[in-house]
A protein has these predicted regions:
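C-terminal accessory/regulatory regions appended to core domains
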Residues: 1-211
Length: 211
């Protein structure tokens, strides 16, 4: 890859050319890990992530290129957008796990995500039971029982996330791909549901405070 401005050969796809200082385009296929100079991994060093994000964001902040030519302004905006997305996603354990799964072909954020895998029957029954119980508490405006459910669901969410992370480590280390993908997918599907449940209880609390 060469710099679009001075044609210098670039190594490791820098955000700016070390020779002429011009902002470079986002490379085709760049991942959120690439944006922050990280290898795909379940764990990341958060202080390093924070430092790299701030350093690179300062280099390409669009305000610095208000008078630059249109091409460089566009590149600065693209780099900034990617950096912000990378920082927002990779600093969060669950979001990072979902993204790692997506990089390996399972995107649970898609509308048709449910059709990508068959969830265990026991989990589907659990979902129905939780839903019915929460609906009952909501109808009765019984906040304390809902909070008790939320505490239990929070523990289940944490356990499911740990299960997903174990499967993703196995996947990244070259383990049995199909089994690791299925295990991570099922665990993260539970994380997604439990997260929504907790958000609904939080909404109940906000409604109670507003009354």
């Amino acid at each position: 890859m060469d710099c679009w401005n001075c044609q210098s050969e670039l190594v490791a796809a820098p955000v700016v050319c070390p020779r002429c200082g011009k902002v470079q385009p986002v490379p085709a296929g760049a991942t959120l890990f690439d944006a922050l100079g990280l290898e795909p991994a379940v764990e990341v060093d958060l202080p390093t992530l924070e430092r790299t994000y701030r350093e690179r964001s300062l280099l390409v902040h669009p305000d610095r290129f208000a008078t630059a030519q249109a091409r460089e302004r566009r590149f600065a905006l693209e780099q900034t957008t990617l950096l912000n997305d990378a920082y927002r996603t990779l600093r969060d354990r669950a979001a990072r796990a979902f993204y790692l799964l997506k990089l390996n072909g399972r995107d649970l954020t898609r509308e048709d995500a449910g059709g990508q895998m068959a969830m265990p029957h026991a989990f589907l029954e659990e979902v129905m039971e939780l839903r019915e119980a929460l609906d009952g508490h909501r109808a009765a405006r019984a906040l304390e029982p809902a909070r008790g459910m939320a505490e239990d669901v929070g523990h289940r969410r944490a356990a499911a996330l740990e299960e997903a992370e174990r499967a993703l480590r196995q996947l990244l280390s070259g383990g049995e791909r199909a089994a690791a993908l299925d295990s991570a997918s099922h665990a993260l599907a539970r994380v997604r549901y439990f997260t929504r449940f907790l958000e609904e209880v939080e909404a109940m609390e906000e409604e109670a405070l507003a009354q």
